[in-house]
Every structure is written in structure tokens, then in C-alpha cells.
Amino acid sequence: MNLLEYIRKRNEMTRPEWEEVFEKEEIEILVLIKRMGGAGKRNGFWEAQVNFLAYEDYNTGILHKEEGLLVYPISDEEYENDHINNRFKDETIYRLKVRLKGQEDLPECMTKVAENRLLLVEILEENAACTSLEEILTEYKKPIILKDEILGDLTLNKELSLFEGNLAWQDEIIDISLDINKDNKSSWTKARNSMKKMLLEQGNWDKEMRNFAAKKLTALACEWRDSEDEPVPEITEQSFSNRITLKSISMTSGGSFSAYFDDDDMFFGHCIIVQGSLKKGLLSANMGG
């Protein structure tokens, strides 16, 4: 079963069919909530999801350190009244009654977090005491800083799996982010090396990105200019290239990047996004949000 087939199958499930995916036995656990998730529409109900960092079996004391999802059904009315985000607090330990997920035919590309699902039956206690989970929370809160002689100090945004920092680009300070797999340190190295390679060739990249964006978007900028009530200066490819200002670059471990430029109000404050890769060069330029 591929991922698309799996998603379609889940979306067609009624609530009783969905609940049958989980084991009948109810167990008590202590769980460390990471953050509230969202909700996906099923057949007649919504599946709410809450990310957790780890849980401990309340009766056996066995600790499960794998991240996962706590799920529970909600009605259309509850969804519309935003009854998703008021049941749990981030980074808080709860004592719950849950049902473990049973055996299920899953696509190979399914993430471990998505596989590790628990069905919420009842909330028994908030701010429960659990030494092992408290230690995990303390460790989770510690900042992870990647030090690099060229890129400087980069801090891991654990929620987004991004290393974030800033550096000098063409004598101006810009923000950078490395889009990585936080559980795979080789992706840290690849993204860092890709960013350094681009930085070492920043003069060429800066010129090429500006010219590329100007070629792709000057005509559109002129249309926006013509919609102004008051006269504004003519926009040419040269003036477009000169007016935009690089603000940030996001780099992946595979060498793909997105560069975000300030538009100097040519698009009334919308950013300009230039995308490409170190291997293939520049691929697209668009007006962003």
C-alpha cells in the first residue's frame, strides 16, 4: 500500500472503523506532551492529534522514549468551536488512559512518529509527577547550538527542524536557516557545507539571483505599479535588481535553497522568493506572502 492509498483509506473510515485500529485493552500511562498538533477530517468526525515526546507505562514503569501522536475523535461542532487546542498544555506531563495502536498495514514511507499513535480514552491527571519524563523534558529544553567558524553559532529550532542564525552577506547581515533532519546528524553536515559553499560564492549568487528575479518579475511589478493611484517611478529590470534586498536564505541538506528578498514596496510589501540548487542553478522567482 502506498501513502496515497493509505490516506484515502483512513479518510473513508467511520469513527467505529477508525477506533478498531487500536487495541481493545485500556492502559494507564504517564505522557510528556510536546505540543498541540492539528486535526484531519475523516468520515463524519475529526481526528485530533497531539505530539508527545515519550511516555511511561503507569503500572509497569517501562519507559518508551520514542516520539509519537496522541489522537482522539472530535465532532464538527467541537472543531468549529476550537475544542482541539484546549485539552492539553505544551511540555506538560499527564496521566492518561489510552489504547495502543494495533497491527496495521502501513506504507514504507510512514514516519515513526505517525506510526506511534495512542488513542486517548480519558485524562486522569494534569501536571503529574514522573522523574524519567521530567528528565527528558529538561534535556529537551536545553538549546542545541552548532558552532561553525564560517557560519557562526546556529541554534536548533526543534519544532521546525531548522538550525537558525545570521551572517554577513555582501556587507549586510542576513538570517540563515538549515533545513535538516534533527535525528540525522549527517544532514546537519550536508546542509552546513552547502550553505558555506554558497557563502564562499556569494558575489556571483547575489548578482545572479537579483538578475533572475528581475527578469522573471519586472513585468508583474509594472502591473502593480500601474494600479497605484499616485505616479511612481518607472520600473526596469535594472532598477528592480537594484531595489530588492536579500533578507534570508534557507538551505537543505541536498543543496536546494530559497532566498527571500525585501521588495522595496514594488509589490506593496510582499516578499520575493528565489529558489534553486547549487547543482541546477536558479529555478524560480515568485512573489511571496
Language model regions located:
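Structural detector for short beta-strands of small beta-barrel domains
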Residues: 5-57
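OB-fold and OB-like beta-barrel modules that bind single-stranded nucleic acids
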Residues: 29-32, 91-102
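Short, structured beta-strand/loop micro-motifs enriched in basic residues and often containing a Trp
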Residues: 48-80
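Short nucleic-acid-contacting surface segments enriched for D/E, G, S/T with interspersed K/R
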Residues: 76-97
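OB-fold/S1-family single-stranded nucleic acid-binding modules
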Residues: 97-136
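Contiguous hydrophobic, core-forming segments of folded domains
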Residues: 137-205
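Long, charge-rich alpha-helical interaction segments
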Residues: 177-243
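C-terminal structured interaction module
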Residues: 237-289
